[in-house]
């Protein structure tokens, strides 16, 4: 983790000191706070509610992929042995704990007070689905609302890793019923051409036109990013 701080974030966060962090959780907290405070300065004069959004960071270092999630969203990865895996985070009451609350003491205190009075409404749930091994079974982990959401996966085990906003689960049909999310993920992660902006090309040229033709629309913004790992590079 200390090497990650030095190698990956030295340019963006030049004041980071290696001795300041002994655990990945500490790094997670530092990076989150640094980003939101810099964003607040950059958006001075703009309505601050624009910063109430999920942030997902994925980076590769030392043969591992690290994913830091702040808010709600999805991590999807194709394991070479176990197949497709889906990790989702959700907050009871549809009230994610956004980084922006850390830059506003009043919002932070209000969120903490509400979480103290109604803990069942501010529980973070991390859901694990092994889509290929057992698609109907999931493992739920209940956490406090501010629990660090961190994934660390060896590159050698991966052929693909994707991060996505919760909008990927917002597609509904003409009856206003949610479509099969796992099937949608299988369609998106079925990558034939790996050149250029392959995710954008896949979504804009194939997935979205096909869904629209079937009267299936999304009611929330969809953001997706992905890593594809070369078989030879992974050994």
Where do the model's predicted regions map?
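C-terminal catalytic subdomain
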Residues: 116-235
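Catalytic core of PPM/PP2C metal-dependent serine/threonine phosphatase domains
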Residues: 12-76, 108-155, 216-219
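Short helix/loop capping segments that flank catalytic or ligand/cofactor-binding pockets
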Residues: 66, 77-79, 171-173
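Primarily the active-site beta-strand->alpha-helix module of PP2C/PPM metal-dependent phosphatases
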Residues: 1-17
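Short, well-ordered strand-loop elements centered on a beta-strand within folded domains, enriched
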Residues: 64-69, 82-90, 233-235
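Short, surface-exposed, charged loop/turn segments at secondary-structure junctions
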Residues: 73-75, 81-94, 175-187
């Amino acid at each position: 983790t200390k090497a990650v701080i030095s190698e990956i974030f030295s340019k963006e966060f030049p004041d980071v000191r290696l001795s300041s962090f002994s655990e990945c959780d500490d790094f997670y907290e530092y990076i989150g706070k640094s980003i939101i405070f810099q964003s607040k300065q950059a958006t001075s004069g703009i309505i601050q509610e624009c910063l109430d959004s999920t942030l997902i960071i994925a980076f590769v270092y030392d043969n591992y992929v690290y994913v830091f999630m702040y808010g709600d969203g999805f991590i999807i990865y194709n394991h070479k042995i176990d197949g497709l895996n889906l990790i989702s985070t959700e907050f009871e009451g549809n009230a994610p704990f956004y980084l922006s609350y850390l830059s506003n003491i009043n919002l932070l205190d209000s969120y903490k007070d509400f979480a103290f009075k109604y803990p069942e409404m501010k529980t973070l749930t991390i859901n694990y689905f092994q889509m290929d091994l057992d698609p109907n079974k999931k493992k739920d982990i209940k956490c406090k609302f501010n629990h660090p959401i961190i994934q660390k996966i060896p590159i050698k085990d991966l052929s693909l890793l994707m991060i996505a906003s919760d909008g990927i689960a917002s597609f509904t049909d003409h009856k206003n019923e949610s479509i099969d999310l796992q099937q949608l993920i299988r369609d998106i992660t079925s990558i034939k051409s790996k050149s250029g902006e392959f995710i954008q090309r896949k979504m804009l040229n194939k997935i979205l036109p096909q869904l629209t033709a079937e009267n299936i629309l999304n009611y929330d913004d969809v953001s997706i990013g992905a890593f594809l790992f070369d078989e030879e590079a992974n050994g």
